Amino acid sequence: MKEKLTHFKVGQIVNTQGLKGEVRVYPLTDDIERFDELKDFYLGKDLNNKLAVEKVRYKGSMVIMKIKGIDSIEKAEKLKNKFMYVSREDSRELEEGEFFIADMIGMEVLTVDGKYVGILEDVLQYSANDVYVVKGEEDKEFMIPAIKKFVPTIDIDERKMIIDPIKGMID
């Protein structure tokens, strides 16, 4: 059984902003406002390198962040292209029926009749609804809309997704 991730990637520092050490962050989360609540984060996968957030603001789809101890453009330059991680405990609380994509990837997908369809490989996020990308046998790829009508059951603990496909969806 796949172990749950302990940390999630929430953004990538892509550039500096100004001369006083602010950085531009490309958010890797579907909830950009989660940065308002961010008190600290890990830089890269080094869980000993925890940095504190001083201030957050937004410019278009980017997050502009001031990090405690980063007070010059030279220090900020050293953070470019690094990924930001938060611990599972510090991630946002999920509503009933919501799951972290990282916990879903790799789960087995079956029909309501018990027929094996494949493995969940990706989740595409669209404004209307998400779409599950399932890799079947012989590298066939199926796109399943993430709505209750087609996906009546997701069992994170058992790592199974049950789908109720219409004709042509998985043929």
Curated annotation (Swiss-Prot):
<dbReference type="InterPro" id="IPR036976">
    <property type="entry name" value="RimM_N_sf"/>
</dbReference>
<protein>
    <recommendedName>
        <fullName>Ribosome maturation factor RimM</fullName>
    </recommendedName>
</protein>
<dbReference type="GO" id="GO:0042274">
    <property type="term" value="P:ribosomal small subunit biogenesis"/>
</dbReference>
<comment type="subunit">
    <text>Binds ribosomal protein uS19.</text>
</comment>
<dbReference type="InterPro" id="IPR011961">
    <property type="entry name" value="RimM"/>
</dbReference>
<keyword id="KW-0698">rRNA processing</keyword>
<comment type="similarity">
    <text>Belongs to the RimM family.</text>
</comment>
<keyword id="KW-0963">Cytoplasm</keyword>
<keyword id="KW-0143">Chaperone</keyword>
<comment type="function">
    <text>An accessory protein needed during the final step in the assembly of 30S ribosomal subunit, possibly for assembly of the head region. Essential for efficient processing of 16S rRNA. May be needed both before and after RbfA during the maturation of 16S rRNA. It has affinity for free ribosomal 30S subunits but not for 70S ribosomes.</text>
</comment>
<dbReference type="GO" id="GO:0006364">
    <property type="term" value="P:rRNA processing"/>
</dbReference>
<dbReference type="Pfam" id="PF01782">
    <property type="entry name" value="RimM"/>
</dbReference>
<dbReference type="InterPro" id="IPR011033">
    <property type="entry name" value="PRC_barrel-like_sf"/>
</dbReference>
<dbReference type="InterPro" id="IPR002676">
    <property type="entry name" value="RimM_N"/>
</dbReference>
<keyword id="KW-0690">Ribosome biogenesis</keyword>
<dbReference type="GO" id="GO:0005737">
    <property type="term" value="C:cytoplasm"/>
</dbReference>
<dbReference type="InterPro" id="IPR056792">
    <property type="entry name" value="PRC_RimM"/>
</dbReference>
<dbReference type="InterPro" id="IPR009000">
    <property type="entry name" value="Transl_B-barrel_sf"/>
</dbReference>
<dbReference type="GO" id="GO:0043022">
    <property type="term" value="F:ribosome binding"/>
</dbReference>
<dbReference type="Pfam" id="PF24986">
    <property type="entry name" value="PRC_RimM"/>
</dbReference>
<feature type="domain" description="PRC barrel">
    <location>
        <begin position="96"/>
        <end position="169"/>
    </location>
</feature>
<dbReference type="GO" id="GO:0005840">
    <property type="term" value="C:ribosome"/>
</dbReference>
